[in-house]
Amino acid sequence: MPESLIAGIPVHFPFEPYPVQRAYMEKVIHCLRDGTNGVLESPTGTGKTLSLLCSSLAWIRTRQSEHQKQMVKMEKADFSGLGGGAPGGDLSELAKTMGRANNWGVPKVIYASRTHSQLTQAMRELKRTAYANMRSVVLGSRDQLCIHPEVMREQGNSNKTNMCKLRVHSKTCSFQMRVESRKDHPDLRGPTIMDIEDLVKVGQRLKICPYFASRELVPQADITFMPYNYLLDPKARKANKIELGNTIVILDEAHNIEKICEESASVQIKSSDVAMAIEDVTHIMQVFASGESQDMAGDEPKDFTLDDLTLLKEMLLELEKAIDAIVVDNAVDGTTFPASMMYELLGKANFTYGNVATIVSLLDKLVQYLLVASQQMSIRKGGTFTLLSDLLTIVFANKEDVMSKVYASFKVHVLVEESKQGHGKQQGAKQQGGWLGKGTIAAATGLSKVAKIINFWCFNPGFGMEQLLNTQVRSVILTSGTLAPLKPLIAELAIPVAQHLENPHIVDQSQVYVKIIGTGPDRQQLISNYANRDNPKYISSLGQTILNVARIVPDGLLVFFPSYPMLNKCVDAWQASGLWADISCKKPIFLEPRSKDQFTSTMEEFYQAIRDSKGAVFMAVCRGKVSEGLDFADRNGRAVIITGLPFPPLKDPKVILKRRYLEANRTRENQLLSGQEWYNLDATRAVNQAIGRVIRHRNDYGAILLCDSRFKDASQVQQLSKWIRGHLGDRPQCSPFGPIVRELRQFFKNAEANMKLPDERETDSPLETVCKTEDEPLAAIPKVKREPGSNATFKSANESAIKVEMANSIKTWTPADYASAAGHKLGGAAPNAMDFMSRLDSNVSSIDFNCCTDSKSGSSGLVKIHKRERSSPTAPESSSQVTKKRYKLVENIKVEPSSSQAKEAPEERAAFLRELRSLVTQDQFRRFGKALLEYKNGTYESFQALMAILLDVLSAPKVRYMLVGMRKYLKNEHKDEFDRRVGNL
């Protein structure tokens, strides 16, 4: 691949980078080099993801090379001064080496995005770069990765998580138990980048748990992909053992990062949750009293006592009483209280900083107990205990010494909880009563008149970012296609930012047509504000506008509404008036559904309709699935209509409190937005995201029509993406509808005449079309002549890998594309896929689809090879199968103690430390280094501390040789005890 020198770092890029891509990569490298943070905006379609991955991994690779040279230099320097040496000299030199090496660690990259489909897109981008052989792993949830049939039958993520924990704890999950012995299998450690689906397939083939196997890959990975919540939620970081020290954190698609940070620090609890928790505790107590617990859980000792349950029930009863005593002045909108009220509320039930850890531990144990019990009787599985655990964890997450900041950033909002079965006191008593009714304070005193919902809301996203920075990360890079304006974003997140960028678009001015349409064909004003949205004349004029545009725009037309109610209102009116039928005559209409299953089928039908000469219309809402994630490149989206500004609900309590928070904390120094500016920006960012569904690559073209007269206001224009503002000019005005129709028709006529048609591959399958890259310019990819039947073969091979949910991911990268980007000249036919894979690295053949055949062999040969690999290891071998035979032997080797003992630890200190670092986690290596330095000048107690760490880290059979190798570095008086303790393993 072409190499470019960017900011002093050689970067391999699939093609010669455009100026906007070079500018972007320079900013990234400056951040990594200097250990600073960056906020970088680059429009969708400019190659942002590709630039981000190539620049960051190029810098990592350069650092790895420098690190290796330093280690060799240090090793030579250390041994040049060694002679005989006094006893203990080895220990002193090892400690000295350890101290230096600890500061030399090469940073690793954590790439986080909002959804797994976005992560899959990034991983597919990585596959087509020169950095595809760098070690990578993706972290997913149990819901996505678990393959245990019993666990997968559970409903809801929480139940699956708890059932998984139970089976792991009780050692009844064979998939998890095989991970340790098979975690080094070539299929798992091979050079191929594996996304979620690949991990599941490997797990099923090896009969190991993909969830825990992926965690084993993290310590050695150069780049780890994960969703936001794994990174920003302290609970998730702890549960997944994610270490952030000296890491580079990349937050892609970060336009919603403020909301995500706020939501990760917010929590909700209901009166009904507390009542059900009391019910569940009482049930467990009755089981204990009756002796049934032995039958339910066998002879295993309980992790809690009846006294623990009694104390917990008393606390929950007091909490219920305290919640019942809250006075809600406004039954409709609720009542707001200061943050201190939450601590006072929990304090009345004796939940404090001093005991919260113990209570959370007890709640987690009760969840495990109920999961076992639920297998034998019809009871709840402890979901309310999980809710209470989350409440206590989040409320008490901040240390007591920062409470003044907590009080300024949080609010408590109490709402009336509606009864699911009816209204009134009697119905409420029925809902919370049952066999438990006589045991609750509510029933005994009649205090509980109205059930309530307690919201603990965070309005300061800086909390989440501050916790992230406190983990000693090297750099944090926030990036998206729609971050502007940058200053208020940086101010709200409260992070020091050294590098910032607002990139222009990669396309030419002639490829985009942007207009503000202030009136419809009937000269009715188009404005979707509160006063006008019910106006029948406005709704009719908007429909006429869409009809006229649909007559002109070829292929796909996207129409975004501010909300689902507004979408439904327009649809009903147009169906009644006949406008719906008129539009449908021009193009079939598809509506964005809310359910996942319907969404998938609707998208498939839309892409199928695009292949028709008439195209199709897709009507969706801003902030919906379509506006946030999907790629409508080329024919899929030739124009987008924005029907209005999607402002948040003005009277929503959370919106009101957010605006108040900004007004109360805004100063000239911190540059926070005013409440009204934030309100406007929230709407405009959603518009920017919707606009980003079209113009997805260098040779794409399309029209953007803003059908709301408010878009001409300076306050709205300034919040649009920079590249869109460039098309509107300094003083944008609403254009008359007639001239717009003529200009729009001429625009598409010119574009179709002058622009290159999309690659024919994009029209082969509607699902393949959506998976096309947004980054690679089509000019860099020559057309590939397809052999008869090749499309059917391709579709069959990739059918399970391409899904509508991942429609924003890139099109599968083919051998022809790789050869083109790498500078190879292709002949008339596309290269054989297996021959292509063999060229990636001739020395690597660790996964079955890396097996190569002669380029003359057809697809039938490929099928036969796969069948031989899986069912007949003794089948005759060709030259290309020798590697696979060696691979099968590796797979069948069992992990035995003798195999690890036969291996010896490196004699040289630097080599010893290098190998140790590669075998343990960063945290384990840090603990080892600290204990070793203390042992050097310490006492017998320091030896015991060192031994504890050594046995914890190096006692496993596969690494025990390193434990044995530590003997030479110990003091003579401790070697006998070391031998005895190691011998007992």
Curated annotation (Swiss-Prot):
InterPro entries: ATP-dep_Helicase_C, DinG/Rad3-like, Helic_SF1/SF2_ATP-bd_DinG/Rad3, Helicase-like_DEXD_c2, HHD_RTEL1, P-loop_NTPase, RAD3-like_helicase_DEAD, Rad3/Chl1-like. GO terms for biological process: DNA damage response; DNA recombination; DNA repair; DNA replication; male germ-line stem cell population maintenance; negative regulation of DNA recombination; negative regulation of t-circle formation; regulation of double-strand break repair via homologous recombination. It comes from the Eukaryota. Residues 7-303 form the Helicase ATP-binding domain. Disruption phenotype: In males, RNAi-mediated knockdown in germ cells results in loss of male germline stem cells (GSCs) at day 14, appearance of branched fusomes and down regulation of a number of genes including Stat92E expression in adult testes. In females, RNAi-mediated knockdown in germ cells results in a decrease in germline stem cells in the germaria. RNAi-mediated knockdown in somatic cells or in differentiating spermatogonia does not affect GSC number in larval and adult testes or female germaria. It comes from Drosophila melanogaster. Keywords: 4Fe-4S, ATP-binding, Chromosome, DNA damage, DNA repair, DNA-binding, Helicase, Hydrolase, Iron, Iron-sulfur, Isomerase, Metal-binding, Nucleotide-binding, Nucleus, Phosphoprotein. This is Regulator of telomere elongation helicase 1 homolog. Expressed in both male germline and somatic cells (at protein level). Expressed in ovarian germline stem cells (at protein level). Expressed in adult testes (at protein level). Expressed in the germarium including germline stem cells. Residues 863-883 are annotated as: Disordered. NCBIfam families: rad3. [4Fe-4S] cluster binds at C146, C164, C173, C209. Residues 872-882 have a biased composition (Polar residues). ATP binds at S42, P43, T44, G45, T46, G47, K48, T49. It is an enzyme of class 5 (isomerase). It catalyses: ATP + H2O = ADP + phosphate + H(+).
